Amino acid sequence: MTRDKKYYICSNCANISNKWSGQCFDCGVWGSIVEEIINTNKSIIKGSKQTFDKLSCNVSEQLRIPTPICELNRVLGGGLVLGSAILIGGEPGIGKSTLLLQLTASNFESEMRCLYITGEESLDQIKLRAIRLNITNYNTAILAATNLEDIIASIDDNNNNIDLVVIDSIQTITTKELSSPPGTVSQIRTCANELVNYSKQNNIIILLSCHVTKDGQIAGPKILEHLVDTVLYFEGDHNNHFRILRSYKNRFGGVGEIGVFEMSNSGIIEVTNHSELFLIKREHNVVGTSIFAGIEGSRPLLMEVQALIVPSNMVTPRRSAVGWDANRLSMILAVLSSRIGLNLANYEIYLSIAGGLKIADPASDLAVAASLISAATSIPLPEHSVFFGEISLSGEIRKTAKAETRIKEAVKLGFNKVICSKLENLTYDFIFPCAHLQELKEIIK
């Protein structure tokens, strides 16, 4: 007789305990313990011998298949790899399903046989969305199913005719082996594990769409990200028309690469002039505004940094940062006060990265400092200038990685003044190297 036992599993770290608690004892997260029913009547099956292979470099490049979406190829490291499992997460309505449907209906250079499986929509709804997106490739197979065994059986029935499988989404898939509802930790873990193993054994590419939590993390157990080969996040603000696809894990390419897309009525469109998308053309510079020459992955990207400083009557003036680390803003303010005498203790300070972008590059310190100095002194920054450089606690400006790539992107977009840390082997007339914040202050004056 089958024996089912209740366990309590942390939805954050998948730690299993015998009783419920408000906080996970393993990872410390509150409110993450959920009840699961696990079948304990499983017999141990003896394994069989496997054949060893040797590590060699004669793998065919045909294993990587470029997609018709160039921005997606950049993020993936050149294209889709046969037998790989890819997880793509994002907020509801951000465009995950639209991107995946456009991908499956694209015309690949090498003939790709694609299957789009939905657990959230009916077949008629998928067809209506395809009409809205002007998709004319009607050879794409679609299937509405939520049962794992049915999905694998359907793929097996057409195994020789399927190269790419999209499942939208993994939270809706369930297996008959478990009695727990869809979206629970055990269901997600078991179904994802079976699908990943199936893709490896049959050399099929599987793309899994995934929900995210209110904190922007992949919904479900953390092991889900460990199972797959690639983890992508589709980022963006519903109030803005652009979207960014970013890689957080990639066994076949670089991590941190981004692809820039634009959301339109006819679907998702690639953006090639990505830097121009986030910049506003002005005849004269505005007080408190600077341009940061950044790097996202291997891609140079120019971004606008805006600062606003106003007097405050509060005991503790407000410090707000949108798209930038608030703790790092406090550090830059302390360095400006200590090293160049710019005391802003009685002022409210607002910092924003234009376009809803988020910057984690330490080289953005110099652009932020320039915007703050400009806003505090009401002096516009030099026209057609860009900034990059990391600021230390001593006020020194440290060297920055990929400086030449940043400079080339700035020059290409018409900027003729680069204010940055001191560089080696780069001595152009338009480069103004700074060793300390005091030199930056003199340039702004």
UniProtKB/Swiss-Prot annotation:
GO terms for biological process: recombinational repair. This is DNA repair protein RadA. Keywords: ATP-binding, DNA damage, DNA repair, DNA-binding, Hydrolase, Metal-binding, Nucleotide-binding, Stress response, Zinc, Zinc-finger. DNA-dependent ATPase involved in processing of recombination intermediates, plays a role in repairing DNA breaks. Stimulates the branch migration of RecA-mediated strand transfer reactions, allowing the 3' invading strand to extend heteroduplex DNA faster. Binds ssDNA in the presence of ADP but not other nucleotides, has ATPase activity that is stimulated by ssDNA and various branched DNA structures, but inhibited by SSB. Does not have RecA's homology-searching function. ATP binds at residues 90-97. A motif (RadA KNRFG motif) lies at residues 249-253. It comes from the Bacteria. SUPFAM superfamilies: P-loop containing nucleoside triphosphate hydrolases (SSF52540), Ribosomal protein S5 domain 2-like (SSF54211). Has a putative N-terminal zinc-finger, a middle region with homology to RecA with ATPase motifs including the RadA KNRFG motif, while the C-terminus is homologous to Lon protease. Its EC number is 3.6.4.-. GO terms for molecular function: ATP binding; ATP hydrolysis activity; ATP-dependent DNA damage sensor activity; damaged DNA binding; zinc ion binding. Belongs to the RecA family. RadA subfamily. Residues 348-445 are annotated as: Lon-protease-like. GO terms for cellular component: cytosol. A zinc finger (C4-type) spans 10-27. InterPro entries: AAA+_ATPase (IPR003593), DNA_repair_RadA (IPR004504), KaiC-like_dom (IPR014774), P-loop_NTPase (IPR027417), RecA_ATP-bd (IPR020588), Ribosomal_Su5_D2-typ_SF (IPR020568), Ribsml_uS5_D2-typ_fold_subgr (IPR014721), Rubredoxin_2 (IPR041166). PROSITE patterns: RECA_2.
